[in-house]
């Protein structure tokens, strides 16, 4: 089943402010929270859907990516979607706004740690960017330690639950009328104490490792577009790995220049073909096509080939190819060619106004 538009899920416009997005999510979260709707699968699905939408639209970078690429921005790693995010973590951002409103408001939970997001720059040809491509990338990033299986200790018995916070990673301090939750200083928020750390990772549970992934780049991407690979960023012990963002850089093309959905190119035309007119062949991204050059074509004349441009991500419209004529003046003339040009020059000197319309308008303006 196709995912709904995130703005539609929250019931806000695409120009909604951060505050409007937060209020919309809070309203839906209050309505569909599982504690208010026990054994209601439909309410649980709506709560998760709203939380997923809020996770993206409340983050300026993710929102910008979504506005440009839609759900494609987060489905490049094969796994798709938002496999690792926690709706409860998002929900907890509202703190005491919800505290005590639901059955679980008073219980203490360990906030799951999350690794840092990583960035990988992928260089593409224009053809790859326009058509989409699958590429294999290799990079080095912190991954679960293979010696201790990411536990921080080879022997599970050497890992104890922190006695200060009882494994939650946080402690509650009473300050007057208010109860404040803080990171446990004994275990530093880990919830566990390692008595005998792994010698390979020194108890961190992670180690740098070379990784290889296949990335699917959707058709129509442009410079600066990013694809998110959920959970492929920095790994952390007893926590959620960050994401890997693959940023697209499109190499300069020898023929075409891209501007949004449109492509531009210069078409060299001989002075004879420009004067007399001719049907020529030009390249496009889909193969060669014919272009009719009318008699008397001047440098700078633009011809538009509709539908020969690019279909951007999240668009059903295909741009155009705009061909700019560049009339070439011949060089290294033979003696015969020089004679012919002199003859032509002699015939044009007395009739330059009719044969050179731009020259005529130039001198008319000059002497007005």
UniProtKB/Swiss-Prot annotation:
List, separated by semicolons, the cofactors it needs: Zn(2+)
User: Is NADP found in the keyword set?
Assistant: no
The stretches annotated as CXXCXGXG motif repeats are 145-152, 162-169, 184-191, 198-205
Q: Give the UniProt keywords, A-Z.
A: Chaperone, Cytoplasm, DNA replication, Metal-binding, Repeat, Stress response, Zinc, Zinc-finger
Q: Name one GO cellular component term.
A: cytoplasm
SUPFAM superfamilies per the record? Chaperone J-domain, DnaJ/Hsp40 cysteine-rich domain, HSP40/DnaJ peptide-binding domain
Instruction: Please state the residue ranges covered by CR-type zinc fingers.
Output: 132-210
Q: Can you state the subunit structure given in the record? A: Homodimer.
Give the protein's recorded name.
Chaperone protein DnaJ
Organism of this sequence: Acinetobacter baylyi (strain ATCC 33305 / BD413 / ADP1)
């Amino acid at each position: 089943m196709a995912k709904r538009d995130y703005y539609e899920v929250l019931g806000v416009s695409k120009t909604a402010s951060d505050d409007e997005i937060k209020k919309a999510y809070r309203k839906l979260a209050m309505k569909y929270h599982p504690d208010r709707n026990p054994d209601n699968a439909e309410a649980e699905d709506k709560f998760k859907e709203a939380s997923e939408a809020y996770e993206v639209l409340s983050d300026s970078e993710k929102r910008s990516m979504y506005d440009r690429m839609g759900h494609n921005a987060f489905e490049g790693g094969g796994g798709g979607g938002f496999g690792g995010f926690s709706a409860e973590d998002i929900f907890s951002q509202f703190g005491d706004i919800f505290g005590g409103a639901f059955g679980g408001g008073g219980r203490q939970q360990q906030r799951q740690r999350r690794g840092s997001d990583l960035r990988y720059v992928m260089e593409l040809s224009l053809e790859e960017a326009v058509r989409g491509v699958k590429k294999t990338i290799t990079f080095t990033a912190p991954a679960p330690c293979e010696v201790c299986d990411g536990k921080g200790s080879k022997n599970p018995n050497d890992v104890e639950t922190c006695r200060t916070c009882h494994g939650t990673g946080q402690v509650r301090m009473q300050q007057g009328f208010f109860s404040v939750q803080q990171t446990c200083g004994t275990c530093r928020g880990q919830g566990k104490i390692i008595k005998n750390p792994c010698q390979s990772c020194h108890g961190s549970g992670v180690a740098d490792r070379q990784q290889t992934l296949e990335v699917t780049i959707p058709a129509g991407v442009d410079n600066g577009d990013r694809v998110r690979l959920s959970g492929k960023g920095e790994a952390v012990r007893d926590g959620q790995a960050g994401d890997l963002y693959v940023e697209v850089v499109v190499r300069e093309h020898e023929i075409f220049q891209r501007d949004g959905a449109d492509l531009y190119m210069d078409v060299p035309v001989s002075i004879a073909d420009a004067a007399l007119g001719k049907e020529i062949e030009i390249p496009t991204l889909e193969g060669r096509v014919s272009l009719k050059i009318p008699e008397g074509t001047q440098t700078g004349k633009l011809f538009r080939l509709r539908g020969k441009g690019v279909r951007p991500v999240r668009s059903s419209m295909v741009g155009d190819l705009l061909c700019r004529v560049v009339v070439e003046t011949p060089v290294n003339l033979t003696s015969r060619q020089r004679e012919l040009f002199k003859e032509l020059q002699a015939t044009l000197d007395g009739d330059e106004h009719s044969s050179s319309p731009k020259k005529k308008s130039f001198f008319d303006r000059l002497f007005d």
